[in-house]
Amino acid sequence: MSKEKFERTKPHVNVGTIGHVDHGKTTLTAAICTVLAKVYGGKARDFASIDNAPEERERGITINTSHVEYDTPNRHYAHVDCPGHADYVKNMITGAAQMDGGILVVAATDGPMPQTREHILLGRQVGIPYIIVFMNKCDMVDDEELLELVEMEVRELLSEYDFPGDDLPVIQGSALGALNGEAQWEAKIVELAEALDTYIPEPERAVDMAFLMPIEDVFSIQGRGTVVTGRIERGILKVGDEVAIVGIKETVKTTCTGVEMFRKLLDEGRAGENVGALLRGTKREEVERGQVLAKPGSITPHTKFESEVYVLSKDEGGRHTPFFKGYRPQFYFRTTDVTGSIELPEGVEMVMPGDNVKMVVDLIAPIAMDEGLRFAIREGGRTVGAGVVAKIIA
């Protein structure tokens, strides 16, 4: 039997279900797979195979996530679902599964609950750009006014966290009803799929973004100059391009006079490739690991930012004791550690292993960063936390 060929023809979009425990996220995931397979063709997945999520390790953090895939006529979706609330928090903070859009599941029987709010806040902090609401269990509510009330509450809650609550799609359905093959609820799943297609714009591909390459190594080649190596994170580097060296020290500009891969000279390097870039007139000691090579003006160095952080539990190899204000660990960005101090939110005296917390970080040296950049928190080379830059302060 020949292997199925992966069709690269359709745009690929990453989504996931978020929301309060027991509001039906996994049931909805199963319903989407089942109904779309029935309507558009494809492979159905049953509830058990989704809920029984395998353990993954991202930066030493144990996260249970299940990944399913489905198709609409226009797109291919990769969808992530997590069994437990802690898994969601870790998943969103580490970026183990980056989302182009989230499906917020709210049970019509309960309305918004504490984790509904927390997931919306996290979505805002970690930069989930679009949210679509699926109001679940609507078959268990026979009062039309109550459904309207819940919808209004959810929209207001989203607006509170700067999502366009009044304008985003809200679909009232029943995941279980759809799984059981009831036509009126199956139609709601198709409506959800159409909302995904129209409301979430096609994500920009890494290769089309502004060039950026974290510098992993620097060496000089007799008679040719300085070469920096690394994996291109985004964009394209062409021979002759002007580039900026950003982070740690003052930003300097130079020109890339050569690109090589596996000792072969190329005209350009593209996102995802490991390359060496030859820099004109740059001395070996002017560049170091931890800086980035980038399109001039596309990224700036910063030292102070607000972040959302998950602190590893003892079982995950994290700290055994809490930390307090005045804690000074290393913050590992892309390829290097930088020492920094922290400020905890008002009223938070200490942070326990296994907690997630909002904190302001002040680094001793600037790092090239954008909002949404992930980092690890380390003590002597051991990872004790993971975080994401939520808002740049200075």
Curated annotation (Swiss-Prot):
Assembly information from the UniProt record: Monomer.
Organism: Vibrio cholerae serotype O1 (strain ATCC 39315 / El Tor Inaba N16961)
Predominant place of localization: cytoplasm
EC annotation from Swiss-Prot or TrEMBL: 3.6.5.3
NCBIfam families: EF-Tu (TIGR00485), PRK00049.1 (NF000766), PRK12735.1 (NF009372), PRK12736.1 (NF009373), small_GTP (TIGR00231)
GO cellular component, one term: cytoplasm
Superkingdom field: Bacteria
CDD domains recorded: EF_Tu (cd01884), EFTU_II (cd03697), EFTU_III (cd03707)
Coiled coil: none
Name of the protein: Elongation factor Tu-B
Region (G2): 60-64
Entry similarity comment: Belongs to the TRAFAC class translation factor GTPase superfamily. Classic translation factor GTPase family. EF-Tu/EF-1A subfamily.
Residue intervals passing through the bilayer: none
